[in-house]
Amino acid sequence: MTSLNKCIGMMDEGIERTIQLIPQLPAVEAKLSRLMLMVSGSLNEELELELKPHKLNHSEFLTLMFLYSRPDSSSTPGELCEFTKQGATNMTRIGNALVKRGLITRGSSVDDRRRVVIRMTPAGKRLVLKMVPPLFPRLEAMFSGFSDTDKKNLGRLLRKLAHNLDQATGHPETNLGTMKATK
């Protein structure tokens, strides 16, 4: 497999050639967009490899992590669809797979029996505690050489880009002033 850096070099060369054919191409923006897609794809591939021994895919992992992060380890199918960027049909499939493995349960809300609530089971919590800590060294290695300021700025800039994407795609509910930067 070709290294990510080699692919990035090929992308840079390709965009430079494309500028000759389409001079009005916003080259910096095109390079940044493609660079983010390439890095994102590589991150996703790495995560999928880490999840494979646990027989999970990325969407199932996101679902478990979202539930794990909730104060009561529960959510609704709609919230899960929104967070994981999955449609209702695929979220049903994800839920079925996780229920079958005993990692989550589906039930009615105590407040409204018509409302479905998805809860993480103790087995789901144990799986998260087993598989997440081994991811830490790789995560830290990816950001080696980044100062705390670099990481803070990257987070701020990505949030700013997310805000602009929301605005451009008709999802203006994001308020840039209230977005919190992470460490």
What do the predicted segments below correspond to?
Residues 1-54:
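N-terminal leader segment of winged-helix/HTH proteins
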Residues 1-24, 149-183:
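C-terminal regulatory/oligomerization modules of transcriptional regulators
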Residues 27, 37, 41, 45-87, ...:
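N-terminal helix-turn-helix DNA-binding core of bacterial DNA-binding proteins
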Residues 30-33, 37, 41, 85, ...:
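Short amphipathic alpha-helical segments with heptad-repeat character
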Residues 77, 95-96:
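Short, hydrophobic-biased segments on the C-terminal half of alpha helices
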Residues 96-156:
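Charged, amphipathic alpha-helical coiled-coil/dimerization segments
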